[in-house]
Design a protein with these regions (language model features):
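A short, flexible loop at the N-terminus of ABC-type nucleotide-binding domains that lies
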Residues: 2-14, 18-31
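The feature captures the beta-strand-to-loop junction immediately N-terminal to the Walker
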Residues: 45-47
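Helix-to-loop junction immediately C-terminal to a conserved catalytic motif
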Residues: 60
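Conserved ABC ATPase "signature" region
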Residues: 107-125
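Conserved ABC ATPase signature
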Residues: 129-133, 137
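ABC ATPase C-loop
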Residues: 146-147
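Catalytic Walker B motif of ABC-type/P-loop ATPase nucleotide-binding domains
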Residues: 154-158
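Single conserved hydrophobic/aromatic residue that forms the stacking wall/gate
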Residues: 166-175
Length: 175
């Protein structure tokens, strides 16, 4: 009974996970073990080049471990370090639309778009072409996309790298 209940609660678990990039002899990540047993506010802290981004890609399934087991039933959203690596659509609204459940009314879709744009201080940017956005605005748009997607885990890779620190922590904490 407890095992079946644990499988219903979103979780992420690493058991002896190791990873190295192709051509590298040493593992960037070696026998990593941890578990996140429920959604919440979690941070991975480390020096540049220590494998934080790689760890997030492993969690999200973008890359596979060399050894070990990753057990996850989480519905994961990701905000990459460089927003240009994930923005696909020509304007803010269309980018948000590809991240939202389309099985809801148009009225509710509009309200959700308005809500998340307000959360990231981009009210009125709905029709704005993505190519006109600054780096910080693009990063905020990717955070809005993660928020609107209703994922139970959102992974943010260097969310404060684009100099809008005043916004990021309150936005992330309010989710």
């Amino acid at each position: 009974m407890i095992d079946s209940l644990e499988n219903e609660i979103p979780h992420i678990k690493f058991k002896d996970v190791s990873f190295s990039y192709l051509g590298e002899k040493e593992n960037l990540i070696f026998k990593c073990n941890f578990s996140i047993k429920k959604p919440g506010f979690w941070m991975i802290v480390g020096k540049n080049g220590s494998g934080k981004s790689t760890l997030l890609k492993l969690i999200n399934g973008i890359i596979k471990p060399k050894n070990g087991v990753i057990d996850s039933n989480a519905n994961i959203g990701m905000v990459f370090q460089n927003p240009d690596h994930q923005i696909l659509m020509p304007n803010c609204r269309s980018e948000l639309l590809i991240n939202i459940n389309q099985n809801i009314s148009q009225n509710l879709i509009n309200k959700k778009i308005e809500y998340v744009l307000d959360k990231v201080e981009m009210t009125g940017f709905e029709k704005r072409p993505v190519y006109t956005l600054s780096g910080g605005q693009k990063q905020r748009l990717t955070i809005a996309c993660a928020l609107i997607s209703n994922r139970n885990f959102i992974l943010l890779d260097e969310p404060t790298a684009v100099s809008y620190t005043h916004l990021t922590l309150p936005t992330i904490c309010s989710v």
